[in-house]
């Protein structure tokens, strides 16, 4: 229905936010735990920001590769380009819950149940994170014909990096003075993976 309404109003770009702390919503064949673990949370906050109320039922779900292809085709028939978003280096609790080795903290987060930014941040000094991103991008590029991909980049908690000796070593090796520079270097590296 949303795509039909967009077409009615001649809107031709749909930015699809597919990942966040609260859930990973797209099937990636190389990383099945993203949807086995990362797509579900054991409860969810209700009643708005900072509400103490929770629905204690399991929440979640994800789009299969077939679902994605069908939606991309449906949008294209309406002259709508879908721009996928895969959040990084923050807003990655769902991915890290599924693959803890990607995270910056010693204790990996769970899939977030509340709607504020969490401490789930990629360990950007670890080459496994870059390989993970490349692998995910390879599958995203196969599914989406868009010339664009959105990589998020907001609300990264530097505290997640402060406690990580890999990040300290990385900063020294790269002659970086602060965490903004760490994020900038990471973002530039990720941008170079987009082909």
Kindly give the residue locations of the regions a language model identified.
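Conserved, mostly hydrophobic/aromatic
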Residues: 6, 82, 133, 151-152, ...
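Hydrophobic faces of well-ordered beta-strands that scaffold small-molecule active sites
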Residues: 14-16, 82-86, 149-151
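Generic structural signal for well-ordered alpha-helices
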Residues: 3, 68-72, 86, 133-141, ...
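Short, well-ordered coil/turn segments that N-cap beta-strands
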Residues: 10-12, 76-80, 145-149
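A conserved hydrophobic secondary-structure block that centers on an alpha-helix together
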Residues: 1-21
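Aromatic- and acidic-residue-enriched carbohydrate-binding clefts of CAZyme catalytic domains
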Residues: 22-77, 92-131, 159-180, 184
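Short, internal active-site loops enriched in acidic
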Residues: 88-90, 154-159
């Amino acid at each position: 229905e949303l795509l039909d309404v967009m077409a009615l109003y001649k809107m031709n770009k749909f930015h699809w936010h597919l990942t966040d702390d609260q859930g990973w919503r797209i099937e990636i064949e190389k990383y099945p735990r993203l949807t086995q673990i990362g797509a579900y949370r054991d409860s969810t906050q209700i009643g708005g920001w900072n509400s103490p109320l929770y629905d204690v039922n399991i929440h979640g779900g994800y789009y299969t590769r077939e679902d994605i292809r069908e939606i991309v085709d449906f949008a294209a028939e309406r002259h709508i380009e879908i721009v996928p978003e895969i959040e990084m280096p923050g807003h990655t609790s769902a991915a890290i819950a599924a693959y803890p080795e990607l995270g910056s903290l010693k204790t990996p987060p769970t899939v977030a149940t509340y709607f504020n930014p969490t401490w789930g941040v990629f360990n950007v000094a670890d080459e496994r994170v870059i390989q993970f991103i490349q692998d995910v991008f390879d599958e995203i590029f196969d599914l989406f014909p868009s010339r664009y991909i959105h990589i998020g980049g907001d609300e990264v908690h530097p505290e997640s990096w402060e406690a990580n000796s890999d990040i300290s070593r990385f900063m020294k090796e790269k002659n970086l003075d602060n965490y903004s520079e760490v994020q900038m270097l990471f973002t530039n590296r990720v941008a170079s993976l987009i082909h």
